[in-house]
Each structure stands twice: as C-alpha cells, then as structure tokens.
C-alpha cells in the first residue's frame, strides 16, 4: 500500500492513530509528524549528543507503536507521546547514571532570553556559557518545566498532562525555575 506523505497534513492525530491501528504503514505518517519536535525535546531535556538522541528517539517510537492501542482518544495525542518521550528519556538518563550533558543550542538561549522577564532583567550579566551552566544546574523538576514551557512552547495544561502534575504545581515549578535561574545568573 502506498501512503502519500501529503496526507500527513490533512489528517488529525486521532485519525492517524486509528488508521495506524488498522494498518501499521500509517504509523510512518505519525512518526514523520513528530520526529523533529520529539528529537528536539529529547536533546533539550537530556543534553545528549545527536547520535544518542536519535537512539532514544527510535526507542521512543517503538514504545509509542507498541502502546498505540492503549492511547485514550479523549486525551491530546501530543501530550500522550510527550509523556512517553519524557519518561523514556529520564529513564535513559538514570540508566547512564549521569546528569544531562551540558548541551543547549545557542538559539534556545536566545529564545529563553527574549521570552523571560526574569532573564531580561539580568540580560547584561548573561552570556551563553553562563546560561548553559545555569540551566543544567537546575534540578530536573525545574529544568523539565522550563524546557516544556519556554523551548517547546507548551501550554500549562499540556505540561500538566505530560508531567502528570496538577496545573497549579506546574505553575509553581515554573515560577521557582525562573527564580532559581535568576539567582544563579545574578551570583
């Protein structure tokens, strides 16, 4: 069966999930749709090099495929796959017995700087190396919400769904993440 990649833009995630359950070839459309954003999320969350990030992404897509039948269509599909991606990435980091490697794309730092009032206040003290160190010195719980909100541009509800935390907790964690980032930068 030939699948037209152009169909990818026309079909909703839920339609593609349903079609993938009936014909595994349609999973290619789902994986094509989410490959770039998930790869970027894994890299931002973990700090792994490109090759290791690709490996984690492949494992994530296998998990998504194997668990596709357990997806609840009442939930947002992107939240569901980001949750799987998040859990698997954190599990991989624990297996490696390491904290994330200090990798952040300089463009991400510019994006954070331009979207954070806290960072705008300390913009003159912020250079790229300092920002990398500051972000990776945060506890995982703060770094996770910061990456999802600022770099992945997720709404609070979607972050809550991905992290399986109440929306109030997400808001508190994000607020604390920016405060801690500010404290580190000011030092």
Region annotations inferred by a language model:
Residues 94, 143, 178-187:
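Short, Lys/Arg-enriched C-terminal cap helix and immediately downstream tail that follows
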Residues 10, 91, 99-128:
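Internal acidic/polar
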Residues 145-149:
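A short pre-motif secondary-structure segment
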Residues 31, 39, 50-67:
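Conserved RNAP core-binding helix
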Residues 70, 83-103:
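Arg/Lys-rich amphipathic alpha helix in sigma70-family domain 2
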Residues 49, 155, 164-169:
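Helix-turn-helix DNA-binding motif, specifically the short coil turn and the N-cap/start of the second
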């Amino acid at each position: 069966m030939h699948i037209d990649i152009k169909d990818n833009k026309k079909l909703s995630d839920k339609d593609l999930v349903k079609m993938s359950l009936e014909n595994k070839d349609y999973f290619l459309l789902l994986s094509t749709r989410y490959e770039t954003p998930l790869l970027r999320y894994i890299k931002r969350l973990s700090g792994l090099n490109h090759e290791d990030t690709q490996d984690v992404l492949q494992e994530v897509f296998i998990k998504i495929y194997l668990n596709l039948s357990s997806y609840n269509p009442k939930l947002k599909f992107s939240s569901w796959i980001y949750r799987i991606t998040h859990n698997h990435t954190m599990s991989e980091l624990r297996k490696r017995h390491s904290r994330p490697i200090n990798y952040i794309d300089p463009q991400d730092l510019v994006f954070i700087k331009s979207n954070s009032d806290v960072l705008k206040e300390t913009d003159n003290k912020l250079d790229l190396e300092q920002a990398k160190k500051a972000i990776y010195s945060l506890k995982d719980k703060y770094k996770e919400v910061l990456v999802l909100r600022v770099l992945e541009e997720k709404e609070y509800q979607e972050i809550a769904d991905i992290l399986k935390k109440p929306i109030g907790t997400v808001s508190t964690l994000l607020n604390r993440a920016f405060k801690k980032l500010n404290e580190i930068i000011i030092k």
